Amino acid sequence: MEKFVAVAGNIGVGKTTLVQKLCDILNWTPFYEPESDNPYLPDFYKDMQTWAFQSQVFFLTRRLRAHKNLCSHTGSVIQDRSVYEDAEIFAHNLYRQRQIAERDYQTYRELYQALVEFLPPPDLVLYIKASVPTLQKRIKLRGRDYEEEIDPAYLKQLNVLYDSWTEEFDLCPVLTIPGDDLDFVANNGHLDLIIKKVQEKLTGKEVVVFTEQEMNNS
């Protein structure tokens, strides 16, 4: 594997689209989220407190397997949502909502931390940061009915967890993409700017930011 970039961000922020566009231009290989055939999901939606732990362990094992397969690839790769987000964002949120019991959550964390130690980390995490109104707009545009019912308060809470996680994450550099200001779907100049910043970060530049002037001129 040459370069390994993971794209992170809230529901509907545009992770998959950015992965597709970066791979098309950079000629890298995309690794998308594993298809969800979680056998616990029907039970989970009926009774979250009973089935949250089992459901999250299933998702974690799928994500770990996908991460392992990715690391055996010979070329450069871009991953759509990382294994870290399962634990640090979604399982953590269920715990905060008291849908996972303390004992189960601590067991889950120990399992996650023990396994992650053996995984090669990305060279770079791209965090697409966007406000709830931007997320709602993009969710509506992609037209998934079940997503349009998502409570804005839920998206807000996930944003809080994403901000906290990316601030503390130290396994590799994190480049924050201002999703409210950059429309990499409709504006090729914005996409070019993102690629420029990604390449700067991957070549070792320590401080890489998106300035207002650059964004306005793109």
What are these regions (language model features)?
Residues 89-163:
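A glycine- and Lys/Arg-enriched "phosphate-lid" helix/loop adjacent to the NTP-binding pocket
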Residues 15:
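Conserved lysine of the Walker
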Residues 18-19:
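Post-Walker A alpha-helix
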Residues 63-103:
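A basic- and aromatic-enriched beta-loop-alpha substructure that forms the phosphate/nucleotide-
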Residues 24-62:
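Conserved substrate/cofactor phosphate-moiety recognition/catalytic segment
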Residues 7:
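Hydrophobic anchor at the beta1->P-loop junction of P-loop NTPases
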Residues 140-149, 153-218:
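NTP-dependent small-molecule kinase module
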Residues 10:
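P-loop (Walker A) phosphate-binding loop of NTP-binding proteins
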